[in-house]
Amino acid sequence: MEVTNLIEKCTKHSKDFATEVKKLWNDELSSESGLSRKTRNVIRNILRDITKSLTTDKKSKCFRILERSTINGEQIKDVYKTIFNNGVDVESRINTTGKYVLFTVMTYVAAELRLIKSDEIFALLSRFFNMICDIHRKYGCGNMFVGIPAALIILLEIDHINKLFSVFSTRYDAKAYLYTEYFLFLNINHYLLSGSDLFINVAYGAVSFSSPISVPDYIMEALTFKACDHIMKSGDLKYTYAFTKKVKDLFNTKSDSIYQYVRLHEMSYDGVSEDTDDDDEVFAILNLSIDSSVDRYRNRVLLLTPEVASLRKEYSDVEPDYKYLMDEEVPAYDKHLPKPITNTGIEEPHATGGDEDQPIKVVHPPNNDKDDAIKPYNPLEDPNYVPTITRTAIGIADYQLVINKLIEWLDKCEEECGNSGEFKTELEEAKRKLTELNAELSDKLSKIRTLERDSVYKTERIDRLTKEIKEHRDIQNGTDDGSDLLEIDKKTIRELRESLDREREMRSELEKELDTIRNGKVDGSCQRELELSRMWLKQRDDDLRAEIDKRRNVEWELSRLRRDIKECDKYKEDLDKAKTTISNYVSKISTLESEIAKYQQDRDTLSVVRRELEEERRRVRDLESRLDECTRNQEDTQEVDALRSRIRELENKLTDCIESGGGNLTEISRLQSKISDLERQLSECRENATEISRLQSRISDLERQLNDCRRNNETNAETERDATS
């Protein structure tokens, strides 16, 4: 259903959003929780309406329409205030899928309307995503995801995006896998886009987004882009495709589906599909023109999200998927052309009936030309015919992949079963049949290539003959007699018809070969099969060349790394030696510092000793003067001894005189006093001799300390000179 008026669209989409939230209101969050494609499309539609209204005078009105929509009889704005509760205990209040969807969408809408500065948006989203991490950690709902709309992304700087990415990458317990993948894509896309001239740009309203790599559908849904938006690509991107819609689920399950896609031949499209509200609407970009080593989203498992959220796989778990040949190619939608009216001619087979799905037959009305009216329509003769293969179980080129995979599985099974396994015979028979099938497939492919070359040759010949016929007719129109030229024209026409018949026979043979390979009677288009085969072979060849280049680069990088490792080992040895030398120097420096400190103390002590030495020298000088005096006094000692002997003589005489009674008492008294003076002087001289010996020993000690200090000062000076050099 197509809607045009913005207010009408906003009213309808607000009602759809409220209905979807109400339906999911009581679904408790768990590890199995996830949003269906219908729910994701409903979210995208309402966010697109709000984004479009930002450049009009209707933005407040669209927001009011959304706020006044009711859920269980209560307006959305009141419900949002209740579950948000000013950010208090949010993880306990948002415990169901419906509340989760309402909380995220209303937060994004409020941010779009009220914030325009990147710092304000970043601050809000930082708090918001921390709440999201708390919710995911509490309930383990890793598959729940509602990404940031493009209207907010384009206002953020790459530093803000990296910081928001770190919110999820550092919260290992949050289990927010898709949010992490979303910001990882934005980070990779930014740095690849800044260094490349290749790009695909998608835009609507005032928002646009460019990428040089494939863009998965969940990224496009988060950014709110649809296949009806304006698409522009650089001219060097030749193999780019836009997926637009899910056609049906494979094998009656939701594990895998068939999708419609449009090959982007032109550089600009005003949308490749109609603007509808279909639940099965899809939008993803597949870019096969860029190196697969930098495009991690090329794999079909990552590009197109399955309906069952728990079947979603991460990048590290996926295997190569080549099921793109199962999808349907459709022409780009042109709103200026009327919608095509097709009649399938057959009914859609029931889910339980029939072993094979039949292709859609396109019935064309007969031409007014009688020759064309009497024979059935052959699409191979129509130059405007666009072949469409639908519900193909497997493409011709994929048979080789299937055979290789089966042989690999059989080899693995044979290794596990061993030589004495009970299935050895069956395994050998299966491998033999696969080998025969592989040989037959190679033979058929060689025949197909031969027929292709013959077809090109015949086509060129037909063009050449057609040109000659035109020249002959031009000559005939300029002459009166054209009988000879008429015969030539008839002959040429016969040759052309024979060439066309042979071409039809070869095409018929090619169809038979293809039907044999496909093991069934199929009325599909040979040309389409050949086109798919050539495209697949070219893609495989490109992938192989890319892998060879990648391997060569890896080997070169490995050799460079080995050289770097050797150099690093050498540097490591030098570093260890340097560390040892540095540690030795550090220990020496520590020792020197301690010695310097000790020498500084000794220097202080030396100054004290010097002062003491000066004092002692002064005392020594005094003592020397006294010693000289004592020496002079010692000279008097002999006189004293002589005096003593004289005294003894006098005493003897005195004694003799007293005994004899003839002495003079006065003379005796005088002599006794002189003797006393001499004895006093003698005692003083003895005391001076003792003091002199003590001072001499003290002088010897001080001289010894002075010599030690001088030697220490000389050693310190030499050490300081060595450290300085």
From Swiss-Prot:
Main location: virion
Ranges where the record places region 4 X approximate tandem repeats: 609-718
InterPro entries reported in the protein's UniProt record: Pox_A_type_inc (IPR007596)
Residues in Sequence repeats: 609-635, 636-663, 664-687, 699-725
Function comment: Structural protein that forms a matrix surrounding the mature virion (MV) through interaction with protein A26. Presence of protein A25 in the virion structurally prevents direct virus-cell fusion mechanism.
Assigned protein family: Belongs to the poxviridae A25 protein family.
Name the record gives this protein: A-type inclusion protein A25
